[in-house]
């Protein structure tokens, strides 16, 4: 199974991505975790990433695509992947789709977790992970960035017949079951 997870900050992409990965026996690749790992190792790339993460801004496409596609290609040996937090823009999606098609590992589905703004605000306030990118100001900015840059991806993936919309406001288990039902229909 090869799945891309989309949704605003606080929609549950990480939680649901891990559940999908566990159910289908494939790696869960989180762009946020890859970025935070790179920052923790204090590489030059990590230092560059840190500036963008601290501000809640999108990381430049060339940097993101390189990091993510290296990991996706490595993960494909495990029979697929669940990718969460990437792509965030149509140009990223186009570049990733080309690289994946060239490697014969195109996404089978794009799961979009829909959550009302008031629920997102509550979730981000309650998350309590201690992440710098969860402060109220940065969280608001991340939601604005999502709306401006990521929402066009919904049209992009709808036109390609890949988008699966899931109401992610119910409890976690109910959301997982809705996702599994949709993916099981795709996976046959």
Task: Annotate each PLM feature.
Residues 1-188:
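Glycine-rich phosphate-binding loop of ATP-dependent small-molecule kinases
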